[in-house]
Amino acid sequence: MYSLELLQKLFPKTKADVLNRYVEPLNQAAGMYYILDTTTRAAAFIAQVGHESGGFNFVKENLNYSADGLLKVFPKYFPNRQLAEQYQRNPQMIANRVYGGRMGNGPETTGEGYKFCGRGLIQLTGKNNYQRMATDFQCSLDECVAYLETATGACYSAAWFWDVNLLNDLCDKGDFVTLTKRINGGTIGLQDRMHHYQLALQLMG
């Protein structure tokens, strides 16, 4: 079980009232998808969603990058400074360029890259993922977008993503690196994720 005390020890920089909003839906969602069945699963889940959401401080992807940030994080989409400077500090334009034309999104000009940018505790991204969730949750795409930004929706979407991507199996195998890749697409933030995982194991053991 996740308690407010546990979340405060794991994410001490986050305000208690913010963390408290997530305690009940976290336990309900994680319980529904068998994440609370073992300490290993529960610790991995809280470490991963905690990292993805900046310690539960945001449920929508922050794409407010400077030109330098764009060159570093998205070199494939911003190969030179001139282009990066045209997009810097404009999250909508950045999302449409980076996510447009892939993951089920239409081209950059459709605006779907921004509409289906990362949301929820696990940063669900792309129209394909949104559509799959909307189908399973029996809601429209627009309802899905709004739901992901609520505490309840943020928790249930994360636990749902965990389930459909068979992440409990990776937890049971102890493969934290592959688990991170399934969520992040790479290993960005692996050290922080691992730190919170080990701490959660210690606190929940």
Label every PLM stretch briefly.
Residues 36-41, 114-117, 150, 174-175:
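Extracellular/periplasmic catalytic domains that process cell-envelope and extracellular macromolecules
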Residues 2-21, 50-160:
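Peptidoglycan-targeting cell-wall enzymes and recognition modules
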Residues 182-205:
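Low-complexity, Gly/Ser/Thr/Pro-rich intrinsically disordered linker/tail segments
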Residues 49-52, 172-189:
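Acidic helix/loop microenvironments that form the catalytic cleft of cell-wall polysaccharide enzymes
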Residues 10-44:
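N-terminal carbohydrate-binding/catalytic regions of secreted carbohydrate-active enzymes
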Residues 157, 162, 166, 182:
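Ligand-binding pocket segment of bilobal, Venus flytrap-like solute-binding proteins
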Residues 33-36, 166-173:
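Surface-exposed helix-capping loop/turn segments at secondary-structure junctions
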Residues 1, 38-47, 174-179:
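Alpha-helical scaffolds flanking conserved acidic
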